[in-house]
């Protein structure tokens, strides 16, 4: 039951450890009746056949006579759409020594020709039905599985049957044409080059340290480049015949369709599949070796400073039963307490680390055990290590308190209860992913109600002694094994780490001190008011409301997601009001919400609001500052009180700002370790002609930044002008009026907003470059990036023209994918897109970028010139336009069935009625575009003499040597 264990770790984490720390996830009673007779046998039965947990009866589970499993579930969120997943029970662990990387390579070849689909046609065939390459048509290979993913824009017979046909071709009809294989080698090499970053190299070293002598450490999915470049066709065919077989396959279909019909369509497509070749062997993963305290250092510039401490044991593949889930819940409650304590330490003045987390996890069936992950600034490893070790030992020695246990039970119960309430409107793709995970882990796909029932049975009468025993057991086994990643050398090396760990284990620890319980103090904001005006926009299901103090409320009740309400409060003028000649530390805007309230610290807030679904996230936009949260109907009034409290009484405590100042330079160094990261950091400023409102400051400017500067700018801006509130989701108009009238509507009337200055409205795209702008990254010398952009227009005035340009960018994406990836094999993922500002007049651009070796940059720029010349000189075919347009339209339709789309698009509608027109015309504008329109905007904007170019190459003459 691997997936449940991993999900528990995520669900109870009390602190968000910075991405990249910890073990990496690498990827590329009653049971429903089986609805088909079974002659062939799958390699793994459905999880419910080995469990007392009932599977979700909304899912039809079955097995074809040839052994292929299938799971079919009707779900109408979003309506008329579906998701198909074809999974194979084989990944990189199943490769022989001469096949390293071929499981992943084979996944790529599924898009490169089969017996009944010519090479290059599969993607186009799906695009003609509205499936975009990458977004709706994708695949991945991990250590233990390979999966193909199709997201269907509708469930017409043509779309469903074509999609099933494509997957059926993948199952047994791939050709592995020698020329196609050779062409794809460059794409795989390009993918390896793109993914070859310090974090991945650290992960490989970590796996080797944790699992010595086991297969896992030598089977990363990307594989061996020498094999990728030279593997003969026979090796591909050998793996394909051994592991792409019906008894190793699972077909998953979720969506808005008739289950009987979908089952018949799956049977029609796959029942004739037979693979007479011998089944491939399951991988022998190797044994966990007995070990004592050990330390390993991975040192490389650009890697995150972190320490992972594990206590490892042999992996036990227990069936997914109620008893096993209860065991996992109990252990996770204890880990949640430890994570909460870590969170408190990270929020203190001069904290010992940036973040820390604890959990229990397995490493791809190879080992399992308790773990600690600590992230800190370079050079601060010793204090971080000591604090984490001693806090973990404090938990083991003294255990959790009753108050701590009750809080974590409340937190988990709240999450599970909310999931039950929204179960009927879960997203189709999320359900397909959950079924895929269940199939991979051989778990039971149970209902949220069943999950809650098991949890409640687990915590009924649960004692701290039981939790403490589970935690102590989690932190036993081989080790502790400490893996340290560092961008700078550590004096004394591994011996110093080991000595510090052993010395820390000798330091006595005291019992924990539990904070006093607080109450929510923000319930009154003045005299509640009623609206002074109300207008309905019937066709959009939206109501515009004004209050006497000038508050403007927009409400759109929806049935997209049960028990979900999204709220945004906007005020001030955002970037429009910032100076363009000096940086204001808006990069530390998280200090607003993390600083808590005048009457409650952030930690006290979390304690008071335990059991409630509310949030308060602060953001800086182009023309406003915003506070936002996600809630449910029963907590809606509290959500509005929380946002009003943050609006009227933010504490601006200094610790969160200081934490950003201390950690940001190191984080930026990590981002600069790749060409894409370095360009992302530099581009916002460069593409704004050096305007200091955009882009990031220097390390010296970060060191000199003051909280008072940020506070003054934000406070003065949001203190004047109207407050705009947008509420979307499972809410009524009356409930929204009352909650806003009691909070923001009760605030004093506000002075008029100061109009933005001409300088504030000015954002200028840079002039054309005679030679590409040079940008340096800190990664390996074989990585580079080329970028070309052309100025276009904003989305303030001619919205239809802006949408035509966005469609031009989609056509450009098709062209560069076909030319740079498919024909040349020069890059893994070339990209093209368009952006147009809704705030800054005349600001917008189209761009193309690709990561290639540095010696290929000149050729890349030539290819981009050739592609854009073709778009200017010759009108595109209707087929190509439709392939670009259909995916755009279907993506938009999908978005229009989500609350987030409306939350973003309804901003400003009180004062800008043209926004309402733009919403109404979003699809029709795209549908009206002709090939001539695409050529016209290409000629207008993709001008050679207007292009801005950049090249990103390594500052290092050679690749750094990892130690």
What are these regions (language model features)?
Residues 71-73, 78-97, 101-105, 120-169, ...:
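M16 family metallopeptidases and their MPP-like homologs
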Residues 180-194, 198-247, 252-266, 275-280, ...:
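Hydrophobic, small-residue-rich alpha-helical packing segments that form membrane-like cores
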Residues 174-182, 198, 650-658:
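Short secondary-structure capping/junction motifs at helix and strand boundaries
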Residues 173, 178, 185-186, 199, ...:
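Non-catalytic, conformational "gating/processing" segments within enzyme and secreted inhibitor domains
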Residues 28-72, 258-329, 335-343, 347, ...:
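Proteolytic maturation boundary segments
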